[in-house]
A protein has these predicted regions:
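Acidic, low-complexity Ser/Thr/Gly/Pro-rich repeat segments typical of extracellular/periplasmic
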Residues: 4, 20-206
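Sec-dependent bacterial lipoprotein signal peptides
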Residues: 1-18
Length: 207
């Protein structure tokens, strides 16, 4: 009788412990709504006398690149055979830009990623992230700021893309339909836009 009672109590304890364990289910945290943040770049942003073959940009979380064929704007433009960008189809905490051809001397280059950089978990974009460097002694410093107003609607929509085309000997009325813009930015959640590190040239601006 004593042995039976002891085993019964032991069984009851184990059963109760198991039931408690089953009822304790973990809950998820708050949804991530923040975009990735750059923590380092090598060479550093706005480097002058650039002579490297690779640029590495490090972020605070894993990122993916999305639609770089349309989103990425390199100014002055580089052909696809002149560079490679990673990651493509995978995730990483780093973006690597490998330069496969020599760059023009004394020129400021800007890599504008549009909204192609997104975090791996929730797909939050890092809007219009730019990396700039110069192969010469200075970084171009012309800055263009402005405000847009919708000509037909009472409220101007946010997140409007603004494009710049240099007005040179090759520019025509059809240029904006046939070529990607040299420079691009966005009003983000406002109606104000801002271009930086531009050479002092005349431009055609399109919203």
């Amino acid at each position: 009788m004593y042995k039976i009672g002891k085993y019964f109590l032991l069984f009851t304890f184990v059963f109760s412990f198991t039931q408690c364990a089953r009822r304790s289910t973990p809950t998820g945290g708050l949804k991530d709504t923040l975009p990735p943040e750059m923590i380092n770049a090598s060479p550093k942003m706005n480097t002058i006398f650039f002579d490297k073959e690779k640029i590495t940009i490090t972020f605070d979380e894993f990122i993916k690149l999305k639609d770089t064929s349309n989103q990425l704007i390199i100014s002055p433009p580089l052909e696809l055979k002149q560079y490679k960008i990673k990651p493509q189809g995978t995730v990483s905490k780093k973006i690597q830009i490998e330069l496969l051809d020599s760059l023009v001397e004394g020129t400021t280059y800007t890599f504008n990623f549009g909204e192609s950089i997104i975090d791996n978990n929730e797909g939050n974009p890092l809007p219009f992230f730019r990396y700039a460097m110069s192969t010469g002694p200075i970084i171009d410093s012309l800055e263009i700021r402005g405000k847009i107003t919708d000509a037909y609607e009472r409220i101007t929509a946010p997140y409007t893309s603004i494009h710049l085309y240099p007005i040179d000997s090759t520019f025509s009325d059809s240029t904006i339909f046939l070529k990607k813009p040299f420079y691009a930015t966005s009003t983000l959640d406002s109606v104000v836009y801002n271009f930086k590190t531009l050479p002092p040239d005349p431009y055609d601006i399109i919203a």
